[in-house]
Regions:
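Conserved G1/Walker A P-loop phosphate-binding module
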Residues: 1-111, 138-140
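C-terminal-of-GTPase-core extension/linker across diverse P-loop GTPases
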Residues: 2-6, 17, 144-350, 362-363
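Glycine-rich, flexible loop/turn motifs
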Residues: 23-31, 38-40, 48-51, 80, ...
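Amphipathic alpha-helical transducer elements in NTP-driven molecular machines
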Residues: 32, 46-49, 62-68, 82-95, ...
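Conserved Switch II/interswitch segment of TRAFAC-class P-loop GTPases
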Residues: 40-45, 72-82, 93-155, 168-181, ...
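Conserved metal-binding segment of the jelly-roll/cupin
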Residues: 70, 359-360
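Short, surface-exposed secondary-structure boundary micro-motifs
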Residues: 103, 361-362
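Structural motif
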Residues: 352-357
């Protein structure tokens, strides 16, 4: 699953990407420094693995991962091919969700592509380009569906949905903010529209702003805008995150405490991105390895087993499941079994986040 980091030029995208992935992507104070997208595979912070590691003393700890893509800065007119518009739109089309970085800090040394700091205007610049691209997609689909309608009346339903989307897009409303019934959702899913992708806004603030981000005027303007799409906003200072990313764990913890922060902004971004993609983790634990496995929310036990090996899914018999909370409270698996907290679940069991599982199978 890919999450695209987008934003106008010079808002801190590549610095954020470097900090998340420690990949050292080129970062410069001029537009379009990122042309081909940089890609980084990032571990998802999960303190549960550390707790289980103390319990099992494994040879190996393996975190779940997600993929971040740093996409070239977008400018007004991208949907018409301005700047790196066509490349930007094709790269974003390949992602599953969007992390939109928006500048909320003043700094005369960092050029703003539009001359001054106005986060809502910047968000609208990007979102309008995505909307324009989607209008073009919808118009093409409408033309095709109307031609096909003459031969097959089933296309009327698709036309109705397309017209509903077009009407909203032309009012500046992203497709993700439209209410669709289940039948409509199935049609929309097949359209691969840019504005249906889930979105997370990252407000890049100064160190001073971060100390009182809850009351910051610009951050709150972004939050008000995000409410329209039921989107979340994470304020962070990319400069601080860049410094934190170079530190060892103990030094990082010390710096966070000095700043009055419980966790880094990057950890919040990674965790929320994982959630935004509709993902969760089940866990396996033993002496060889303690591991988090990535599945979509709503996945049933046999399909979860298939993430470990296709043979386990094929020969699935049952899953022995205990919740992370119950295991930790009891202290070990034997005590959890004695209390009747380890359950035997069948093929229809829907996995829950933090389930610790042993799959039984036969092939």
């Amino acid at each position: 699953m890919k999450l695209g980091i987008v934003g106008l030029p010079n808002v801190g995208k590549s610095t954020l990407f470097n900090s998340i992935t420690k990949a050292g992507a080129e970062c410069a104070n001029y537009p379009f420094c990122t042309i081909e997208p940089n890609v980084g595979v990032v571990p998802v912070p999960d303190e549960r693995l550390d707790v289980l590691a103390k319990m099992y003393n494994p040879q190996k700890i393996t975190h779940a991962v997600i993929e971040f893509v740093d996409i070239a800065g977008l400018v007004k007119g991208a949907s018409k091919g301005e700047g790196l518009g066509n490349k930007f739109l094709s790269h974003i089309r390949e992602t599953d969700a969007i992390c939109e970085v928006v500048r909320c800090f003043e700094d005369s040394n960092v050029v703003h592509v539009d001359g001054n700091v106005n986060p809502v205007r910047d968000i609208e610049t990007i979102n309008l380009e995505l909307i324009f691209a989607d209008i073009e997609t919808v118009n093409k689909r409408l033309d095709k569906a109307r031609k096909n309608l003459k031969a097959d009346k089933k296309y009327q339903e698709e036309i109705d949905v397309l017209e509903k989307i077009k009407e909203n897009l032309e009012k500046g409303i992203s497709a993700r903010a439209i209410n669709f019934n289940e039948d409509e959702k199935a049609i929309v899913k097949d359209m691969f529209l840019l504005t249906t992708k889930p979105i997370l806004y990252i407000a890049n603030v100064s160190e001073e702003q971060l100390q009182d981000a809850e009351n910051d005027k610009l951050v709150n303007e972004v939050k008000e805008y995000a409410k329209k799409e039921n989107a979340e906003v994470i304020p962070l200072c990319v400069k601080i995150e860049e410094d934190l990313s170079t530190l060892e764990d103990d030094d990082k913890k010390e710096m966070l405490e000095a700043l009055g922060l419980e966790e880094s902004g990057l950890d919040k971004v990674i965790k929320r991105s994982y959630d935004l993609l509709g993902l969760m983790s089940f866990l396996t634990a033993g002496e060889p390895e303690v591991r988090a496995w990535t599945i979509k929310k709503g996945t049933k036990a046999p399909q979860a087993a298939g993430k470990i090996h296709s043979d386990i899914e094929r020969g699935f018999i049952r899953a022995e499941v205990v919740s992370y909370k119950d295991l930790v409270e009891q202290g070990n698996m034997l005590a959890a079994k004695e209390k009747g907290l380890v359950r035997s679940e069948g093929k229809e069991y829907i996995m829950q986040d933090g389930d610790i599982v042993l799959f039984k199978f036969n092939v």
